[in-house]
Amino acid sequence: DLDLQRSDLVVNVVETFEALIRLERQIRSAEASFQRMDKLYRLTQARERQGRASRVDTLRVELKRGQALSRLESDRERFSFTQRDFAELLGQSPETTFALEPPPLLEIELPAPESAIATALSNRLDYAQAWQDYDDTIRGVKIAEKALLPAVSLVTRYERVNDDSTVDEEEDRWSVGLAGDTDLARTRERAQLGQATISRESAQETVRIHELGIAREVRQLMTAYQQARAELLIAERNYTLAENRARLARRLFEIGRGDNFSVTDAEEALHDADLRRLSARADASVTGYKLLRGLGTLVESP
């Protein structure tokens, strides 16, 4: 149980650490987004005074600017809460701050599913415990079967016998017999054997359920890891496209060939693409550690 808790703790630490990394990057992104929206707002105000933009245009950009500021404040608050949780996980003071450095993603060479399942069955402590419980029930059945045997003991007797007709002659007599209890039905022992047999069958079924569950879990974890890495590539590509679109929209607006609607739409798309990219990066990291936990290789066991 302690080793299983250690593996869960490692994954929990990784999840919280990746959440901190993601939130820290979100804050940087939100700060840059707010600065761009603030610049757009001031530029739209100037155009409104020149008669090149309507009041509706200015109010719309002002609303987007306020939303960008709200997201920034929300990200900062979430980062503060998550940092306290991370400090407590590490046994540090809740006020501890950390200099965060994103680690490289785990590069796991995926084996064939059957090989991965075999690895998990060889290393998973919960599966080993199920087998240990089954072995204990087998010993329990053997003990119950032995107790069912009648309690028989060998009895010997020796005596010297004098024959009254011949005073000088004595005879040695030996007798051998078997003694046992009178409860031939062995009712209590039979009940104990029946209970031990049921326990053995139940433990055997538990082993089978564990084996099927581990096989299903390993396949799901491998699929999740592959999907997370693929989604990260897609998210990074989409972010690059959204970034290029937002840059172009801002440039066109600045030279008078575009409107602020195009800019704000592009900024919203960039914000969404950035969130997906950061979430995909965190998922790609966490799924790697979860896969190692599922294989039983995340933490070495003594």
Regions found by a protein language model. Give the residues of each.
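Bacterial Sec-pathway N-terminal export signals of envelope proteins
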Residues: D3, P94, L100-D135, T197, ...
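Long amphipathic alpha-helical coiled-coil segments
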Residues: A87-S93, D136, I143, Y289-S301
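Sec/SRP-type N-terminal targeting helices
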Residues: D1-R6, E31-A32, V56, R60, ...
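Periplasmic alpha-helical coiled-coil/stalk elements that build and connect Gram-negative outer-membrane
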Residues: L2, R6-T119, A224, A228, ...
